[in-house]
Each structure stands twice: as structure tokens, then as C-alpha cells.
């Protein structure tokens, strides 16, 4: 299997379906025949009500879960067909940021960042990479801080640095500002935009917040696991129309 299953080219979902059992002999489709193409370098927002399938779609794209049917293809390689080493290699090209930071409380900010680093890197190069990323996310000088000594916004910055430690070509962010106040949320969004500008990576962000969605290049609205809107925002799409559409979450 090719080793270039990365999102340096288009990310293509074709009729992707994922169902979960909610009771005996009863299933619900969290992703329902989703077909979607995300171009390399795009900043796309997935919106929809709670339970609309945003998180499930991110998990399927990141190969955390497998679809029941349909395919996910990255850079021309079918991710859903990968196993073993090639699958692990693909997962390393994907960074995840979640609403909850999931930092290890006994580790410093630096050690949290470098925890996922590939084992073949030397300890020195790992720590250099960690310091570089902490500086990039605005936490220079906080390398030895424990999570308990950091604000929510600072902890989310550490989580973003950790997600970037293996230089992913795709960043999947699941409600990354959900636990933050408005000031910290705005700073995190600005940080993501800057990091994307520097690296050219693709970002897919799940959010129910219209103001956040309006910052993206692309709006994909989900309802009951299906795509109901797919709008290009890069050409100056009116923010008020984004807000109206995201407001139609039901």
C-alpha cells in the first residue's frame, strides 16, 4: 500500500455511512451517505445541531473509526482500505484538537506536547520541536508549567501544539473553543488561522457557532447525519447569511 496517504491533495468522501445501535434492533445513522470533497489547504466548518454527525464525520476522516459503507480517500489513497503500518502512517499525518484538552496533569506543557512524537526522534530533537511549537502558539517561557497552573485558553494552546507535533497535513478540530470564554475563543481561532497560513495545512473544524463558521472558507451543514448545505465562503459570502443558515440547526 502506498505510504503517501496524506492530505496534501484532495480529501474525498464518497457515500460514507456510519450507524450506531441505540436499542435492540434499532440503529441511527450518524453519517448518512455523506459525499464531500475538501481541497488541500481549505479551512472548512462542519456545523449542525448536537447529534447531527459532526464528531462522527471527523472520526471517520481521521481514521479513528471506520465507516459501515462508502470510502474516504486522501491524496488518491483509499484510507478505508488501509491496515497496519500504512494506517498508522496516515493517522500521523492527522492532528486532532478536542473541546476537552485531555492534557496529562503530571506532565509539563513541554512534555505534554512531545508525548505523541515518533519514537525514532532523539530526545533532544523532540524537545526542540516542542519548544518551537509552544513558541508558535504563544507560550514561550511556559515549557515547565503544569496544566493546573494554566488557564483554559493556555491549556487549549498546549493541546494545539501537541496536535501539530508530527507536522500534520490535516488538522481536525472538534468544538475547540467550546469550553473557552469569548476572548480566549477568539484568540484560539486567530491562532488556527495563523498556523494554517504558515503551513498550508487543511483544517476541518466542527462548530455550532455561526461566528466561528463565518471565519472559514467553506460551510458544510449537517442534519441527521446528512449534508444539507455545502457553501463556498471564500468569495465574500455574506456573514449574515452564514449566521442565518447556521441558525437553522434543527
Please give the residue ranges for each predicted region.
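Pre-NBD coupling/linker segments of ABC/ABC-like ATPases
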Residues: 1-5
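ABC family nucleotide-binding domain
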Residues: 9-11, 15-215, 222
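Conserved beta-strand-loop-alpha-helix hinge in the C-terminal portion
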Residues: 226-250
